[in-house]
Amino acid sequence: MRFTPASSPSEATSLTRGTVRHPSGYWLDSPDTRPHPHLMPTPTRPPHIDDEKFLDHVTDRLAALPGVRGVALGGSRAQGTHGPDSDWDLAIYYRGVFDPDDLRAVGWQGEVSGIGGWGGGVFNGGAWLTVEGRRTDVHYRDLDVVERESARAEQGRFHVEPLLFHLAGIPSYLLVAELAVNRVLCGDLPRPAAYPARLRVSASAHWHGTARATLAYAKANHAPAGRLTEVAGALASAALQTGHAVLAARGEWVTNEKRLLERAGLRGIDEIVRGGVNEPEGLVHMLGRAEAVLDAAVAEARQSGAE
């Protein structure tokens, strides 16, 4: 039996009879280790209906599921930055109890997780499906949790959770960010009026402090030992943490890391990573350059936000 990454059977989420898939997207007790659906090729079967009819069809089916109070379109397609092969990201907002078996019963091809099947926390599960030839992700959103995190964000309070594919993790105010930028397709969902002033201060300070600590640890421990991989990893994490700090200082919502460095004006960090060397002195210098660039970006964002 192959098992990647390591975990215990009790941590896995049963999805189909005879197989068990860990929230990371890898399979246990199956002949092969299958990758997460996001790593699979884009379906080649041509769509049978145009995009608007497809969206109407999927929305109607999701909205009819027991407990669902609203459906929203997210990701690049909600923000107008998508390409022709981009996934369709949909969120179903439920109140009280939602049973993933009701979604499975629709009969769409793909994998449907249980509640909490993506590691628990605010990103509490969903499905990777193929509908009419289109890769379609469905995210579960508990309205009670959404309202709780919205109230906390207004007070400047939040926490950060790990999530697969995210180097910096995700802030709990992600749920509020989604409501701010996503396109509501049906239902009466809460919409934040603006980026909370207290959150701008607290989130920027938290993310910047985390980035500085990440670089400081790498400079004190990994760089002197010539550990290039660890230094590069710390630098990448710190850059994305700083991206969160910059956008928080500006009062701009973030829903994922895909374009975070571009939006924060930090794509130039690539040149520092590209110039990495194995010698300890060179690695220490590389981290120092990165620290200066990241600190300057946060200072500029805070200055512009204060004007």
Could you describe each region identified by the protein language model?
Residues 2, 6-17, 21-27:
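Low-acidity, Ser/Thr- and Arg-rich intrinsically disordered low-complexity segments
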Residues 78, 143-145, 252-254:
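Short, solvent-exposed loop/turn segments at secondary-structure junctions
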Residues 39-72:
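Helical scaffold of the NTase/Pol beta-like nucleotidyltransferase catalytic core
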Residues 22, 26-32, 36-38:
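Intrinsic-disorder-associated, low-complexity terminal segments enriched in Asp/Asn/His/Tyr and depleted
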Residues 9, 23, 46-50, 206:
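Short, surface-exposed alpha-helical recognition segments that flank or form part
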Residues 41-47, 110-223:
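Conserved NTP/Mg2+-binding pocket subregion across the NTase superfamily
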